[in-house]
Amino acid sequence: HINHTLFFKTFLTRLFALYFDYSHTKLRWSDVGMYFQKTSAFDPKDKNNILNTGLIHQDGNFPLVGLVYLTKDACKDSGTSIMLPNKKYKHRPELADEKVRLHKIPQEKLTKKDLEDRKKLILSLNENFEESIRFNNKFNRLITYTGTDFHKCNSFYSGQDERLTLVFFVGKMKSNSQTPLQRLKNQLIQGK
C-alpha cells in the first residue's frame, strides 16, 4: 500500500534537489500533476512497426515536465526523444486536430482506417522534426524537460507486455534562486 501524499511530496522534494540547493533556496511548487502511465505496443510482434512510434507533441506551458521509466528489462529503444523543428516545419493545426481525434479512441477500438490515419500522421509529423536528444529506456531513469519541448516516445514496444512510466507536470515553481539553465543563460547574456 502506498501513501500517495508522502510519495508525491518525497518524489518532488528529491526531484527539486537536483535543481536547487535547499540550504540556500526557498522553494514552493504548485499545480503539479503526477500519474503512472501504462502503454502497449500497437504491434507487439514487430518492434520496428512505425505504428509503435509515439506522436511528436508538446505538453503545454509547464516549466518542468518529465518521467521515470519503470519497466524492468525494457527494450532500450522504448525511450524518449526531444525533437527540434527542421527547415520544413510549419504549424499545421489540422495535424493537432487529428492527434486529438486519434488520442480519444481507446487503442483496442482503433479501426484499420484509424491505424492508417495514425501512420500518415506519424510520417507527417516526423518529416517536420529532427532528433536532438535521445534517452534510452532504463529502469528507474529520470528524464526532465520543459512542457514546450517537442518530444515523442520512440517506441511503445518495450519487450514486455506494457511500458510503465511515472509522468509528472510541474505548473508553477517559485524560488529565490534560479534553475541551472536560468543561471547559464544569465551568464551567457552577461558574458561571464
Locations of regions flagged by a protein language model:
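Catalytic core of non-heme Fe(II) oxygenases with the double-stranded beta-helix
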Residues: 44-150, 154-189
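Non-heme Fe(II)-dependent double-stranded beta-helix
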Residues: 1-44
